[in-house]
A protein has these predicted regions:
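Conserved serine/cysteine hydrolase catalytic core
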Residues: 187-248
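Conserved alpha/beta-hydrolase catalytic His-Asp/Glu region
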Residues: 152-206
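Alpha/beta-hydrolase fold catalytic core
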Residues: 1-31, 53-54, 95-96, 257, ...
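Conserved hydrolase catalytic core segment
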Residues: 96-135
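Catalytic histidine-centered segment of alpha/beta-hydrolase-like enzymes
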Residues: 262-272
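Catalytic histidine neighborhood in serine/cysteine hydrolases
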Residues: 250-264
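Active-site loop/oxyanion-hole signature of alpha/beta-hydrolase fold enzymes
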Residues: 26, 46-49, 59-101
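Conserved HGGG/HGGXW glycine-rich cap/lid loop of the alpha/beta-hydrolase fold
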Residues: 15-70
C-alpha cells in the first residue's frame, strides 16, 4: 500500500475536515475521490494502490465521517455543503481542476459541482449513482443508516456484515469481507463501530428537494468531459435503464461499464472497474494535450 499524508482543511463554518493525500505529479490534475454516504477515505485504497505515484490522489472525508469533524447542525449534512467544502479544499491547494471519482453520494456531489463549477472537472467517474435513484436501494440504505451498532471483535463485525450483505457481493471471500469491514468501521473504547456521525440519517430521510428533471440537469452539466459510469450488475440503486439513458444522453463523452456479480457499489478492486478507470484517465490525458 502506498504511503499518504493526513491533511486537513476547514469548512466555511470552521469544521476541521480530513483528507488523505497520496503524492504524485503536480503537472496534471489530481484524482479527487469522494466517498459514499457512510464511508470514508479508506474506500479508495484500491484507487491509491493503482495510481498513487503516477497521479496525485486525494481522498476526502465528508463532514461527519472518518477523521472529519461532525456537524453540530445535522441539516448541514447535505450535498450543497459538501460541494462548498470541496471547493474550499481545491482553492486551498491551488488545484484548478481534478478528475473526480465519486461513489454514490460522492457522485451526486460531483454532478452538483459540475452544475456550478464545471471548469473544475477534468473528468469524472460516477460509481453506481445517477440522476434517478431506485427506491428499493433508498429503502435498503434507510433501514440501517443512522443505527449505531457495536461489535465486540473484528470477527463478529465481519461475520455480521457478510451475513447481511452477502446477496450484494455473492462472490466475495472472507478476506474481501475483512477488508470491507475494516474500511467502514473503527475501534472505539466501546467496541467496533461504524465511523460516521449517526445524525447523517436525519438529512438522508428528508423529502427530496428537487424534481427528477432538475437532477438530469445536474448530470448534463458533465457534458464535454470524459465520463465513466460504473454500475454494479446487481445494483438496487442505479437501474440498468437509467444507466443506459445516462450513457446515451452524453454519448461521445460517457462510457458505461457494468461490473458483474456486485451490487451497490463496486469496490473498485474489480478488474472491469480498474480497466475502465485506466481508460478514463487516458481520455483525460488526451484532452490535456
Amino acid at each position: 500500500m502506498p504511503s499518504w499524508t493526513d491533511r486537513f482543511w476547514y469548512s466555511a463554518e470552521g469544521l476541521r475536515l480530513h483528507y488523505r493525500d497520496y503524492e504524485g505529479p503536480r503537472d496534471k490534475p489530481p484524482i479527487l475521490c469522494i466517498p459514499g454516504l457512510t464511508r470514508n477515505a479508506r474506500d479508495f485504497e484500491p484507487v491509491a494502490d493503482r495510481y498513487a505515484g503516477q497521479w496525485r490522489v486525494i481522498c476526502v472525508e465528508l463532514r461527519g465521517r472518518g477523521m472529519s469533524a461532525p456537524n453540530p447542525d445535522p441539516s448541514h449534512y447535505h450535498p450543497r455543503y459538501y460541494v462548498a467544502d470541496i471547493l474550499k479544499l481545491l482553492d486551498q491547494e491551488g488545484i484548478a481542476d481534478a478528475v473526480f471519482f465519486g461513489t454514490s453520494l460522492g457522485g451526486i456531489c460531483t454532478m452538483l459541482l459540475a452544475s456550478t463549477d464545471a471548469d473544475r472537472i477534468a473528468g469524472a467517474m460516477l460509481n453506481d449513482i445517477g440522476p434517478e435513484i431506485d427506491q428499493t436501494g433508498i429503502d435498503r440504505i434507510g433501514s440501517y443508516v443512522g443505527k449505531q451498532v457495536t461489535f465486540s471483535s473484528w470477527e463478529e463485525a465481519t461475520t455480521t456484515l457478510a451475513d447481511r450483505n452477502g446477496d450484494i457481493f455473492p462472490k466475495w471471500t472472507g478476506d474481501d469481507w475483512d477488508r470491507f469491514t475494516r474500511r467502514i468501521m473503527h475501534e472505539t473504547p466501546e467496541g467496533i463501530r461504524f465511523e460516521y456521525d449517526i445524525r447523517i440519517a436525519e438529512r438522508f430521510r428528508a423529502p427530496a428537494e428537487a424534481p427528477e428533471d432538475a437532477n438530469w440537469d445536474l448530470f448534463d452539466a458533465l457534458a464535454g468531459r470524459p465520463l465513466l459510469i460504473l454500475r454494479g450488475e446487481r445494483s438496487d440503486l442505479l437501474s440498468a435503464e437509467i444507466a443506459e439513458r445516462m450513457a446515451q444522453a452524453l454519448a461521445g463523452d460517457a462510457e458505461l461499464v457494468v461490473v458483474p456479480d456486485v451490487g451497490h457499489t463496486p469496490n473498485l478492486e474489480e478488474p472491469e472497474a480498474q480497466a475502465a478507470m485506466d481508460r478514463l484517465l487516458l481520455r483525460v490525458m488526451d484532452r490535456q494535450d
